[in-house]
């Protein structure tokens, strides 16, 4: 995408973008929630669709002139339905957090009880964290992983549910390297009369490719982001495998009298006008492009390689005496407990950044350090796989990471980081991103 006009008009922003292009091109991205969007997705993001207000939904807008943005939103919805095998989808949420808020506000009242995975055990802010709306407006209870295995103990989840009787149970994570047993969660939800929501923001691409458990047959609601493993623009989405009459008794007046609203109608109204106004039509157009890409056979090949690369990295880390929380990975990421290496997550993140490798510090289960320091790092393979890297690259990268972490606290740390940075730049230089290349 050419930005010569920006270079002339706003050199400061142009320089920032230029430097970010170099960073993405010459360094290795291992943050699990990041990826490279295709040039086609980027073009849609930067299209004239950004100029159009379109409050409402296709065919029912509050503004005129929406006939072409309606085409884009209809395509996004139909492609998402095909990709995930769902009956209902709302592609308007601006983010995964907005999608989660839309569901929670649709079925809960302030003070209602919810359950979600503890943030420090791999959950997400919107699953009940005390610093987030989900933990401030609702009575949030967190389940966790077993101290020894690092796995979610479903018996403990059931015990908690029977004790606190939640209105909503959330299954999903931002730093859990195993799959979720959605069927078992649904059985627990049914026992206590709770709604079940799956937040698949991280593994959505792997689920769409059929590589992980499908939440659609078991969960009342499924939310996701559209970037991460889906390689789309930054945004959110709400889905339901099957629509159903809302059990809260919300009705609507029709010519034939009052009827019970379908759950899809409740959610649509909660997104707009409930928590949002005008949708981001350029982003929705880009979502449609990304879903179209994900429906191609090449996307499943990509998803298979993402998981293979993660498995190879985890095994290599384990062979070098690193502690992978839960003992390995079945998805695209791993959470590494660095306490046996006597290095904090913050130190590891900073050293690896100097070495041209981007990761994020992350709390580990039962961490005794603050979120600003942490005892671990989170690593993911979506972006490196988009570069065309395979298992051999994954193993070589782990060896480089080990060199950097092993040099922590030594006088040679700067030299080691410089050497590794040169090797990373050379490795990235042999693997151009092509259709996913971040260019000016």
From Swiss-Prot:
Instruction: List UniProt keywords, sorted A-Z.
Output: Amino-acid biosynthesis, Cytoplasm, One-carbon metabolism, Pyridoxal phosphate, Transferase
Q: Which residues carry this modification: N6-(pyridoxal phosphate)lysine?
A: 228
Q: Which GO terms describe its cellular component?
A: cytosol
What residues bind (6S)-5,6,7,8-tetrahydrofolate, as annotated?
119, 123-125, 370-372
Enzyme Commission designation: 2.1.2.1
Instruction: Identify the cofactor(s).
Output: pyridoxal 5'-phosphate
Q: What are the boundaries of the signal sequence?
A: none
A biological-process GO annotation: tetrahydrofolate interconversion
What is the protein's quaternary organization?
Homodimer.
Function of the molecule: Catalyzes the reversible interconversion of serine and glycine with tetrahydrofolate (THF) serving as the one-carbon carrier. This reaction serves as the major source of one-carbon groups required for the biosynthesis of purines, thymidylate, methionine, and other important biomolecules. Also exhibits THF-independent aldolase activity toward beta-hydroxyamino acids, producing glycine and aldehydes, via a retro-aldol mechanism.
Protein name, entry field: Serine hydroxymethyltransferase
Organism field: Prosthecochloris aestuarii (strain DSM 271 / SK 413)
Q: Which gene encodes it?
A: glyA
């Amino acid at each position: 995408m050419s930005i010569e006009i920006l270079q002339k008009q706003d050199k400061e922003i142009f320089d920032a973008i230029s430097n970010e292009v170099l960073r993405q091109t010459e360094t290795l991205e291992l943050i699990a929630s990041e990826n490279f969007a295709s040039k086609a997705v980027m073009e849609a993001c930067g299209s004239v669709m950004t100029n159009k207000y379109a409050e409402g939904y296709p065919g029912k807008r509050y503004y005129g002139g929406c006939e072409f943005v309606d085409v884009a939103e209809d395509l996004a919805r139909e492609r998402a339905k095909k990709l995930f095998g769902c009956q209902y989808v709302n592609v308007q949420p601006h983010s995964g957090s907005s999608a989660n808020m839309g569901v929670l506000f649709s079925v809960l009242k302030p003070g209602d009880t919810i359950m979600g995975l503890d943030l420090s055990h791999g959950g997400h802010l919107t699953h009940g964290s005390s610093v987030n709306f989900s933990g401030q407006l609702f009575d949030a209870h967190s389940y966790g992983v077993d101290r020894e295995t690092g796995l979610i103990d479903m018996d403990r989840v059931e015990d908690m549910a029977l004790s606190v009787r939640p209105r909503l149970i959330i299954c999903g994570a931002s730093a859990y390297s195993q799959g979720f047993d959605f069927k078992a969660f649904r059985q627990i939800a049914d026992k206590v009369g709770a709604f079940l929501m799956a937040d698949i923001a991280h593994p959505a691409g792997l689920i769409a490719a059929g590589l992980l458990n499908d939440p659609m047959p078991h969960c009342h609601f499924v939310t996701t982001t559209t970037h991460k493993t889906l390689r789309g623009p930054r945004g959110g989405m709400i889905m339901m495998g099957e629509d159903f009459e809302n059990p809260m008794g919300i009705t609507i007046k029709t010519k034939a009298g009052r009827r019970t609203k379908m759950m899809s109608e409740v959610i649509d109204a909660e997104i707009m006008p409930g928590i949002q106004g005008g949708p981001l039509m350029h982003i929705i157009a880009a979502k449609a492009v990304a879903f179209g890409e994900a429906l191609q056979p090449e996307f499943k090949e990509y998803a298979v390689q993402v998981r293979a690369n993660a498995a190879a990295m985890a095994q290599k880390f384990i062979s070098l005496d690193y502690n992978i929380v839960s003992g390995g990975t079945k998805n695209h990421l791993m959470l590494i407990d660095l306490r046996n290496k006597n290095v904090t997550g913050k130190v590891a993140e900073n050293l690896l950044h100097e070495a041209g490798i981007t990761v994020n510090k992350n709390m580990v289960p039962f961490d005794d350090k603050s979120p600003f320091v942490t005892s671990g790092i989170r690593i993911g393979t979506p972006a490196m796989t988009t570069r065309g890297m395979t298992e051999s690259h994954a193993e070589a990268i782990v060896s480089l990471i080990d060199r950097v972490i092993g040099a922590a606290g030594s006088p040679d740390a700067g030299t080691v980081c410089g050497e590794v940075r040169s090797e990373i730049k050379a490795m990235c230089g042999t693997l151009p991103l092509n259709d996913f290349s971040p260019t000016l």
